[in-house]
A protein has these predicted regions:
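Charged active-site motifs of nucleotide-sugar-dependent glycosyltransferases
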Residues: 2-4, 181-188, 219-220
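Active-site and donor-binding regions of nucleotide-sugar-utilizing enzymes
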Residues: 3-177, 189-201, 211, 215, ...
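Donor-nucleotide binding loops and adjacent catalytic segments primarily
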Residues: 184, 197-236
């Protein structure tokens, strides 16, 4: 039986991973899974070695204060992956966590194939990372077609797969016409997938909305949030 370890670092990655893996489960029923994941992976029957919330911190200060916990979880994750001995380590987004784990795993056991989903934005910042990534990532799955040229030029194996959440939502659109005014412009607000992000940013975003409404009433503000964060926004 083949084994896949699914490695995520935040709720948005958990959602992306569950969408991709659920499709794989339909075609291949003889694969064993283990993960660092959240509620979405759990819904499709994949257990996590610890709660994803334990590694989702917002901002430099928060990360710094919890650096020993984070490093402990990184080392624990590496140990659990090596013990599970998967054929594939499937890491998703959150490069500061997932790629650090993948690098350590590959160094100890080069036989484990490493596939990373959601390319780190190395063409924007920290371009030097790409040469390092090439040493321990076997294949990168790309969300956006413009990324392919960059990774081709760097001789990194890659495949453009598109964004599954966008594809899935093409036929699953929410009708907001009942609660917005047609003569008003829409401002979309994305507070992030992590609860810590939403809790920190929500007061600032609400102040922004109130400020804008005092200046101009010609706007509708639409929040785009994960299922987990919806109640935080509604109850604020």
């Amino acid at each position: 039986m083949k084994k896949i370890f699914v490695l995520t670092g935040e709720p948005s990655g958990d959602k992306l991973a569950s969408t991709a893996i659920s499709k794989l489960q339909k075609d291949y029923t003889d694969i064993e899974y283990l993960s660092v994941g959240g509620s979405n992976l759990k819904k499709i029957g994949i257990e996590s070695i610890f709660d994803l919330k334990e590694i989702t911190y917002l901002g430099f200060t928060s990360v710094l204060l919890n650096i020993f916990k984070i490093n402990k979880r990184i080392n624990q994750t590496v140990e659990e992956i090596l013990k599970f001995n998967p054929d594939i380590l499937f890491s998703v987004d959150s490069p500061d966590f997932t790629l650090r784990v993948a690098e350590k795993v590959k160094k100890i056991n080069p036989q484990i194939k490493t596939i990373h989903y959601v390319a780190p934005q190395v063409w924007i910042w920290r371009k030097g990372r790409v040469k390092k990534i090439k040493k321990f990532i076997d294949h990168i799955l790309l969300l956006f077609d413009f990324e392919k040229k960059f990774f081709d030029e760097e001789n990194i194996n890659n495949t453009f797969v598109g964004h599954p959440l966008i594809e899935n939502n093409k036929n699953d659109k929410t009708d907001i016409s009942n609660f917005i005014s047609n003569n008003k412009k829409i401002i979309s607000i994305f507070p992030g997938s992590r609860k810590s992000e939403t809790n920190v940013l929500l007061p600032i975003l609400i102040d922004f909305i109130n400020m804008m409404n005092k200046r101009n009433l010609n706007y509708n503000f639409i929040f785009h949030a994960t299922e987990e964060n919806k109640n935080i926004i509604v109850e604020y």
